[in-house]
């Protein structure tokens, strides 16, 4: 109750201050309707397809045998961020995982099934050769991280964890639909490691790529003169309550658009700064931000902290006279976490990723005040063999935009 009252007092103060400051605030030319240099000709891609790796009895430690080994073959691969240096050379960071994991069924007569998690991270250099005005061939090569999380039975390791770096190569074709949209299709090879009975991996995928091309001057000017406000800076104070885990469960299980976690947070406070770098005419804004956060776990009341940088997608749902309502989604923000063992669970090491999603509003005459609610998540995406994951429930935020 004290926290709620403090937030209410702070909100009223900010609203009063924003009204006063709006009288004399100088007008600055908005230069954020064109992609900044580091984003122009950058891209992301989403692909799905077929994966094969020779999982069998060979991966089991001596003394273990499975009744059967189920190897699903559907895989997803995304380029989280790529950049074209010119028409022929680009670099990209990728993430790949099977939709369903390998299962060892009936190990030593057990009635259940045990899963082996496989995940791959990659950083590759990509060369492109135009074949026609729309079709190009490409080859890629670089560094891959292979992460296998095995399982134990009765306190004994049945399939061991494996984590290693290796070269990775691939090739394929691209079909350019427009300057920004392309269809892609290709194959990828990642070597195994005999010393750990890890088989090599072959994946064939297809999908699409979106490239952020510099906008024409007419579009830039149209967006700039739209009359809709997009604050350039936002400073927010956030408080996590320890309540509302049903929201996390709903969006991670019932409608899988977010993630859960094994470690629960009881209380937390965070300070965020967001800087807008691009926006469209009315709906979309892209921010980059940083945050420092302090948390207390639910089970053991263990204290830990995080330091993050992150991208943030902001979508304005309604533009009304009293407020501009928006949704936010942030994915894979690199994070330092002070503890890796929390509530007797192994979350990996001191490197992880921050994700969050929520709703908010800019209010006040000049939209200087931001209020909102969101949920958070920390996870290394199983790029490390241990990844308990941290879920953070309903979090209230209050901020000042300028």
Residue positions per predicted region:
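Short glycine/proline- and aromatic-enriched beta-strand/turn motifs that initiate or cap beta-hairpins
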Residues: 22-82, 201-275, 394-401
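Residues that define the transmembrane beta-barrel architecture of outer-membrane proteins
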Residues: 40, 73-77, 115-121, 161-167, ...
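Transmembrane beta-barrel strands of outer-membrane/channel proteins
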Residues: 44-52, 93-97, 139-145, 185-189, ...
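Flexible, solvent-exposed loop segments that connect beta-strands
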Residues: 55-70, 98-118, 145-165, 195-197, ...
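Solvent-exposed loop/turn segments connecting transmembrane beta-strands
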Residues: 71, 193-201, 263-264, 298-303, ...
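Gram-negative (and chloroplast) outer-membrane scaffold detector with strong preference
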Residues: 80-152, 207, 265-337
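Residue-level signature of outer-membrane beta-barrel architecture
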Residues: 83, 127-129, 173-175, 189, ...
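Repeated loop/turn-to-beta-strand initiation elements of outer-membrane beta-barrel proteins
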Residues: 88-91, 133-137, 175-183, 214-219, ...
């Amino acid at each position: 109750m004290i926290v709620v009252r403090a937030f209410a007092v702070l909100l009223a103060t900010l609203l009063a201050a924003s009204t006063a400051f709006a009288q004399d605030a100088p007008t600055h030319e908005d230069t954020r309707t064109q992609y900044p240099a580091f984003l122009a000709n950058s891209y992301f891609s989403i692909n799905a397809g077929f994966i094969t790796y020779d999982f069998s009895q060979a991966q089991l430690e001596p003394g273990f045998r499975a009744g059967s080994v189920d190897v699903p073959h559907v895989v997803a691969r995304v380029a989280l961020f790529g950049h074209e240096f010119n028409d022929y050379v680009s670099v990209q960071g990728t993430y790949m995982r099977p939709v369903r994991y390998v299962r060892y069924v009936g190990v030593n007569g057990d009635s259940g099934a045990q899963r082996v998690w496989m995940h791959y991270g990659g950083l590759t250099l990509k060369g492109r050769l135009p074949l026609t005005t729309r079709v190009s061939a490409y080859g890629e090569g670089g560094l891959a991280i292979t992460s296998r999380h095995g399982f134990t039975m009765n306190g004994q390791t049945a399939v061991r964890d494996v984590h290693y770096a290796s070269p990775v190569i691939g090739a394929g074709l691209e079909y350019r639909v427009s300057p920004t949209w392309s269809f892609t299709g290709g194959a990828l090879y990642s070597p195994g490691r005999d010393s750990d009975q890890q088989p090599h991996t072959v994946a064939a995928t297809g999908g699409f790529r979106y490239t952020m091309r510099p906008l024409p001057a007419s579009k830039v000017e149209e967006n700039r003169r739209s009359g809709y406000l997009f604050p350039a800076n936002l400073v927010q104070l956030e408080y996590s309550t320890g309540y509302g885990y049903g929201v996390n469960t709903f969006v991670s299980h019932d409608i899988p658009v977010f993630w859960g976690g094994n470690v629960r947070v009881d209380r937390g406070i965070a300070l965020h700064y967001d800087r807008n770098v691009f926006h469209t005419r009315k709906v979309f804004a892209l921010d980059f931000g940083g945050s420092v956060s302090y948390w207390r776990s639910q089970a053991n009341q263990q204290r830990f902290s995080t330091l993050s940088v992150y991208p943030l997608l902001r979508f304005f749902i309604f533009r009304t006279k009293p407020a501009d309502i928006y949704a936010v989604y942030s994915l894979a923000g690199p994070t330092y976490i002070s503890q890796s063992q929390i509530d007797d669970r192994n979350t990996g090491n001191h490197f992880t990723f921050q994700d969050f999603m929520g709703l908010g509003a800019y209010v006040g005459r000049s939209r200087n005040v931001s209020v909102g609610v969101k949920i958070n998540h920390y996870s290394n995406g199983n790029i490390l063999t241990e990844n308990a994951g941290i879920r953070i429930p309903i979090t209230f935020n209050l901020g000042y935009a300028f």
